[in-house]
């Protein structure tokens, strides 16, 4: 790791966060506003200031962007950071998301037809899947170009071979539902950007909310993308009996909203 003052030059910050009850409570607290001022309360609690505040506190002088794409925020932040590194806009980057539930005005609420499971358990891709559960978490990656990391002797935990971003537009059954076509395109484009074929895959970490609608659509999109591949052959030419695992960490930590990527 790096101490803030020893961070690589031009370190960018690409992060996003979920709205919190704490921010709402602090923003409407007249005593707090009287103590430090309404503007300071907003700066310290409003998620739009997250990236520049981190850059300021750590003394990082690269691009600083607060990203907001709902549940895909943290993964979109990683994509933007990767692109910035490849374009030479920064030499290192912090990328990720945060969702922390602190002050709760009510307990766990389930209602018929909603996204939350009736028993408070999330079971992605399971026959008993009936919904997701809210979760809290922070996920941040320190990203560098591989050649720079190796040259400086940095520990390399993983290599990002390729990323892609798409958007469903109106091509889905509802605003909060995923769409098959653009999810398929995102997977295919990511494989192409990585210069790899689906046959190389051993495991897929999916969004996997544990909802009947979302899991089914995600499985269909992954199946379509893996069947086609980038060479038209797909994962099927791995050989008969081959399998690709699929799962989601939400079964352990729940849906972390802006940090779910």
Report each predicted region and the residues it spans.
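Condensing-enzyme catalytic core of the thiolase-fold
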Residues: 1-261
């Amino acid at each position: 790791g790096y101490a803030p003052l020893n961070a690589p030059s031009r370190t960018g910050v690409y992060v996003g966060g979920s709205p919190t009850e704490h921010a709402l409570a602090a923003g409407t607290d007249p005593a707090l506003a009287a103590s430090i001022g309404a503007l300071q309360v907003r700066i310290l609690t409003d998620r739009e200031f997250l990236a520049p505040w981190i850059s300021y506190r750590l003394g990082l002088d690269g691009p600083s962007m607060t990203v907001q794409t709902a549940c895909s925020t943290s993964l979109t932040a990683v994509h933007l950071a990767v692109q910035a590194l490849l374009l030479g806009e920064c030499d290192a980057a912090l990328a990720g998301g945060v969702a922390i539930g602190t002050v709760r005005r009510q307990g766990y609420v389930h209602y018929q037809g909603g996204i939350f499971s009736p028993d408070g358990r999330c079971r992605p891709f399971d026959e008993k899947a009936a919904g997701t559960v809210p979760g809290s978490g922070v996920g941040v990656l320190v990203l560098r170009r591989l050649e720079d990391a190796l040259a400086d002797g940095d520990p390399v935990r993983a290599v990002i071979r390729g990323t892609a971003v798409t958007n469903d537009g109106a091509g889905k059954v509802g605003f909060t539902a995923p769409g098959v076509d653009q999810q398929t395109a995102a997977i295919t484009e990511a494989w192409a950007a990585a210069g790899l074929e689906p046959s190389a895959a051993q495991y897929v970490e999916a969004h996997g909310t544990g909802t009947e609608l979302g899991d089914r659509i995600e499985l269909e999109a992954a199946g379509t993308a893996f069947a086609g591949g980038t060479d038209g052959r797909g994962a099927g030419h791995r050989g008969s009996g081959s399998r690709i695992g699929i799962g989601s960490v939400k079964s352990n930590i729940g849906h972390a909203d802006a940090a779910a990527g």
